[in-house]
Amino acid sequence: MAGEERPERIVVSVRLRPVNAREAERGDGSDWECAGPTTLTFRGAVPERAMFPASYSYDRVFSHECGTRQVYDEGARQVAMSVLSGINASIFAYGQTSSGKTYTMVGITEYSMSDIYDYIEKHPEREFILKFSAMEIYNEAVRDLLSSDATPLRLLDDPEKGTVVEKLTEETLRDKGHLLELLAVCEAQRQIGETAMNEASSRSHQILRMTVESSAKQFLGKGNSSTLIACVNFVDLAGSERASQTASAGMRLKEGSHINRSLLTLGKVIRQLSKGRNGHIPYRDSKLTRILQSSLGGNARTAIICTMSPAHCHIEQSRNTLLFANCAKDVVTNAQVNVVMSDKALVKHLQREIARLENELKFPASASCTSHAEILREKDELIKNLEEQLKELMEQKDTVQSQLDNFRKVASDGDINNHLARRWSRSSDSIPRIVSEGAFSSSDTQDIDYQDQTMDELSVPHSFPPSSQISDITEEHEAQRVAHRAESEPPEEHCKEVQCIETNKLRSRRSQEFFQTPEKKTHTDDQKHSESMSNSAENAIKLYACDFEPSFDLEKPETEESLALKRCVVSSRDSALTRSRSCRASFMVIPNSWFDDSASTTPSSETFRYSTRRPEKVRKSLSPDEIADKSTGNAEEDKSTCNAEEETAVNDIGCVTEVKQKTEMNHAPQSSEQHQPKIAKEVATVSLSKWHIDFERKQQEIIELWHDCNVSIVHRTYFFLLFKGDQTDSIYMEVEHRRLSFIKNSLIADGELHATTASSLRNLRHERDMLYRQMVRKLHLAEKERLYGKWGIDMSTKQRRLQLSRRIWTQTGMDHVRESAALVAKLVEHLEKGQAIREMFGLSFSFKPRRSFSWVGVYSRD
């Protein structure tokens, strides 16, 4: 069992030997010197374009004046002593032939063994078991140095221990003297030969391995019942050599070639490890690297001592040694404490592991939380989300409370109430009185949008302006009110849902409830009847424009003027869209430009009104037939409908104009009533022709936006075939046009057009491939030939189906669009037409907005 990993780098040291007698006789001086404890410098002149540096830095640099004891203490002792802590260790000696590798390793091995035994003597509380083994790699054959048998040994792969040497002798050490005897045997068994550069040159790689196993002598508790086991390797590598320098031949030449081959593999492994563990590491190309695999880049602490000759004749070999050292110092190893658990401790550990796995099986959700840190992170995210929700709710509460306080302040102002009472007292007895806050029923208050009112908004003018002036005043008033709400509301309030259309039954029921109010006493005045009629109507409409729902007290029979005023108010309520729970879409402000008439008397207003409490009810548009019917049926009572605008809501100012005209027309001749149906029909005809022109223009713009935004082919086909010009399609056409325009503009502004275009083109290619496959199943041979001729595809060409699929929906001409839609609808099972499908499909086009401040600007402009 291994403990926690300790990533660290290989400790690299460089040792310079002095110039020997043979080199001194040739007159070779020293080209290298130690500039400091960690820096080695080249003495000679370095060319300007040299491929090698002039100085090198390592963990430690030793000059020829430093002894082996100093080399061991400062470069290898810490690594060697880590074996007593249960960490594997390896010490290498690398360099060219005759550079002093064996001389260095003999001293380091003796010093390490001596320190290990000194440590054992100082810690009698623990029991140590030391085992020793030795091997050499001669001509790529592994031999046991503790055995007289020269038979090569095989290398085996163990899943737990890694690469092991089969039948390798392992001696249990009795004492330090026993160890020295075994070291002498190894020295005698090792292959040594004479060359031109060295009289006693090592011809093989020697590996001395000591395994240290320690455990407590007394049972100190269940937590201290484990055993530490680790090994330390002392590796004396054979030196690299050149045949021209060593003057080797025959057996020496063969030995040199094997040595150089194994050292070349070692250099490749070190170089690959220094770059990271991404590529293939050729451990198995040499037996040396295969045996020392864990020591080079695995579970071990490693120290490499590079020995080199300072003589000028060995300058190239010295640079190669330093290059190897540069790569070695970048290698990272993962040293671990090797712990062997006792049987009792192992059983307990396995029991805990079984309990943990059973708990994960019982509670799968807890399996993902593998640590306390992950649990805390999840809790922090949950707390953060709850805090954000709480903050939003508090902001909504404060906004509603502020609006409610303003409403109460306005409603409780005695001067305003008295002023309104005096104004209503001048009106006709037949005009219903608009009651104050106390007259609102519980059912009516559900649809009230509390608005911030000022004294100027509640003030009533003393003169009645013309209808054109009323239109201008109302437009300015609506613009100011929307701008004020856009500033006071948070951005999140703009992202509310559009309310859908409910049934006529619900609207008629609400209109009936509107008039079912308790009777109360009204203040009447018989004088100045016609003047008070205009002022009272103006007061009623101004209060209703502020989103207060009035209730009427009827004490006297209703006159014709009062009935007209009621119809005006009820028409405004009935035309509003109530909220539906069945369909939801993202909030988008739809303009009523498609329903605008050319009449200059019709005031412009917003289709959607913002509310800090909830979205305002959307006004329902009236079709030309409905306008004609209402004009025909109510010709005697409603003579101002010929100038009414086909908008999504019945305009409030239109009601004022209607009431005023009603009052004036009471004293006029009744001969003009017979012309009303004819005028209404003319208005409907003009509006219908204008609608078709707007529809064709809007449809062409949408087709071009489809082409620019690379919209799905199936989406284009469904939309084109579903919405063919009916006036009820106006809202869907406007939503689609705004959605595409917003996507195009926002992507260009954000700088994401390139990536999004690539994704859209890829999706279009997949759709065309789908159509290409559908042609085999949906089209007959004769039909395909007819389509090829129709689309201009030569019958002698290849892949005609693929050509046809690539030409669909590639142009914006209406003829091309119709043919493409018809073909796609035939290849793809088209949805059945129907009102429900049209509405649900149209509402699904709305684009989900991002909650950012850029949306506020979009809403404010609409």
Swiss-Prot record:
Origin species: Oryza sativa subsp. japonica
Protein name: Kinesin-like protein KIN-7J
GO biological process: one example: microtubule-based movement
Swiss-Prot/TrEMBL keywords: ATP-binding, Coiled coil, Microtubule, Motor protein, Nucleotide-binding
GO molecular function list: ATP binding; microtubule binding; microtubule motor activity
Coiled coil: 340-415
Annotated region described as Disordered, given as residue ranges: 475-532, 596-643
Positions with biased composition (Polar residues): 598-610
InterPro entries in the record: Kinesin-like_fam, Kinesin_motor_dom, Kinesin_motor_dom_sf, NACK_C, P-loop_NTPase
